[in-house]
């Protein structure tokens, strides 16, 4: 398998795996705009040269859009291999490339968000355990922070206090999200429209800076839905799934 690094120089012409469309599509344009601002912060986007979902995205943890204390580590935003790409060892290829790059850059190790049982849009815990990752922290909602240290003496990553007990003081449905995932550009407006049409209390909070993300009241900032203050899910929804959730 041939792999390509997406950079500022080739961002315009390369597809971004999870949203394969032209650059005018709102999902593609929002993701590419977010990526363009991250490259100078050290973000790496490595993908299959073939079209499809086969890529890894990672960034120095100090610049990660999640509320963690993991100075010196590399944070994996997303590792996604699916469809016809599964079962060929490509996840291992991508992870190994990340490990090699992180070692060369003097990082202490890797860290990533996981759940004890596989959840949508989170990495497979069985795969990570097989690769040597272990749990280093866990929030009340079951979202875990896993790590693979290159140095046994290195401090372990941990969640910031604001993320350990996900809760907000607001009634109704409240969604925190970023532009890291391209699907949000399409489906967040769908939820806003659906909620309005069905008189469902709903507010979407677009996290637009690293500082906002690192102080968010949830370990997952990419997509975190709350109801009456309590965390509900990180699974992105269309109108039908949302209405089913609220029993409408």
Feature annotation, model-predicted:
Residues 113, 132-147, 232-235:
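Conserved catalytic-core motifs of GNAT/GCN5-like acyltransferases
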Residues 64-76, 86:
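A conserved beta-turn-beta hairpin within the catalytic core of GNAT-like acetyltransferases
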Residues 141-165:
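C-terminal "cap" of GNAT-fold acetyltransferases
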Residues 51-63, 75, 80:
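Conserved beta-strand in the GNAT
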Residues 81, 87-102:
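Conserved acetyl-CoA-binding loop-helix of GNAT-fold acetyltransferases
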Residues 228-248:
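Non-catalytic, surface beta->alpha helical segment in thiol-disulfide oxidoreductase systems
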Residues 1-51, 161-163, 171, 182-183, ...:
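Short amphipathic alpha-helix that is part of the acyltransferase structural core
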Residues 102-120:
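Conserved GNAT acetyl-CoA-binding A-motif
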